[in-house]
């Protein structure tokens, strides 16, 4: 499981510098560099009433430090200009969730996180700017589920979890070198179902940040630059992906059968897929795709224990799906969001995958080969919008 997140961080570290590449120079120098300190107040979101058996309080402090690299008009990058000069940031944070008061016999742990972030300023007026931020990284939790010592903490099932955050920052330039910001974030911690139980945690956070620029930042302005060529029209993506899934239904069956049910063996998930996407601008493409999936499972055994009978429709490790995908492009990097429907599945009576799924991820497109352009990527697949299913690593070709 830990190996999978290290692979994810390696892929992010390799692909994100593409966002910071300019036509004439790199942004990884002192003239582009800045450092930040921030603090936030985090509140556990409990819309489903899941924390009532564990928590007495819901608020915790967070503090962090960042090192950022801002793109500038003088970089002469069409991509940076098109996205209104985004910024690439690397950060470390401490979330004192271990300070939450809990019921006797259980505890929540602190989170120590490292991450990479993309900051965008979609609105500017004088010394004020406003825009979204996306953070992706890994968190070390000081406390996780244990069937004997911490049975109520079904939210964190492993020591290392993914850290995914999204938010909005309102920034005020108070000096050529100094900036302050008011921030609002949504924060999610999950291990992608590599080990159960893994209900994950969701938090809302508000705070403030102080940033110091090593060099006075340039006045951000849209300039006229030569547009790069791009492959307009229909493009095909052929890919395969794999990951693992530790099933909570299997855990329930094992516990009902008298076993501890921890840890539950992670089982293989694999797929092959084809997408046809229409690239109608340098920044956007939209498409449709089909996938054939394989899932190692214990569906029949789970039903016999939990339901007392087999599913008359039978069982199959294979299932199929169709999906709609929206891509956002930045040089060789693309981000995508997919919404799909399972067209065939035989998962039994106890398993509840639902009919629909969601996928969010990124792909880094390698230099072109004679036939097409290879890419490496990752996806987080979910059901019911908030149920993690699998962290998938993919490889494919675009032509």
What are these regions (language model features)?
Residues 43-64, 101-108, 246-272:
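Surface-exposed strand-loop-strand hairpins of Gram-negative outer-membrane beta-barrel proteins
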């Amino acid at each position: 499981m830990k190996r999978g997140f290290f692979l994810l961080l390696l892929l992010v570290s390799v692909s994100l510098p593409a966002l910071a590449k300019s036509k004439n120079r790199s942004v990884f120098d002192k003239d582009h560099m800045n450092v930040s300190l921030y603090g936030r107040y985090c509140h556990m979101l409990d819309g489903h009433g899941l924390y009532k058996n564990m928590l007495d309080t819901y608020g915790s402090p967070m503090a962090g430090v960042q090192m950022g690299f801002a793109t500038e008009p003088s970089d002469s990058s069409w991509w940076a200009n098109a996205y209104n000069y985004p910024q690439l940031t690397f950060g470390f944070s401490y979330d004192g969730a271990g300070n939450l008061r809990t019921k006797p016999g259980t505890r929540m742990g602190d989170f120590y996180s490292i991450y990479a972030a993309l900051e965008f300023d979609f609105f500017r007026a004088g010394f004020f700017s406003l825009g979204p931020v996306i953070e992706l990284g890994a968190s070390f939790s000081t406390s996780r589920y244990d069937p004997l010592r911490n049975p109520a903490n079904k939210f964190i099932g492993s020591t290392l979890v993914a850290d995914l955050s999204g938010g909005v920052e309102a920034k005020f330039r108070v000096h050529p070198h100094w900036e302050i910001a008011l921030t609002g974030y949504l924060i999610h911690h999950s291990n992608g179902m590599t080990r159960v139980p893994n209900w994950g945690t969701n938090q809302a956070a508000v705070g403030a940040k102080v940033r110091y620029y090593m060099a006075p930042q340039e006045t951000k302005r849209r300039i006229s630059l030569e547009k790069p060529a791009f492959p307009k029209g229909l493009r095909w993506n052929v890919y395969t992906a794999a990951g693992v899934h530790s099933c909570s239904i299997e855990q329930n069956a094992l516990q009902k059968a008298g076993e501890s049910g921890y840890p539950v063996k992670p089982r293989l998930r694999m797929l092959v897929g084809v997408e046809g996407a229409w690239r109608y601008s340098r920044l956007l493409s939209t498409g449709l795709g089909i996938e054939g999936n394989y899932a190692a499972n214990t569906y029949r055994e789970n039903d016999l224990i939990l339901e007392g009978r087999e599913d008359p429709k039978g069982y199959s490790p294979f299932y199929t799906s169709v999906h709609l995908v929206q891509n956002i492009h930045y040089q060789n990097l693309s981000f995508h969001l997919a919404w799909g429907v399972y067209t065939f599945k035989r998962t039994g009576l106890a398993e509840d995958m639902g009919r629909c799924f969601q996928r969010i991820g990124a792909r880094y497109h390698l230099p072109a080969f004679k036939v097409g352009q290879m890419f490496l990527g990752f996806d987080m697949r979910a059901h019911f919008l908030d149920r993690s299913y699998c962290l998938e690593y993919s490889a494919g070709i675009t032509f």
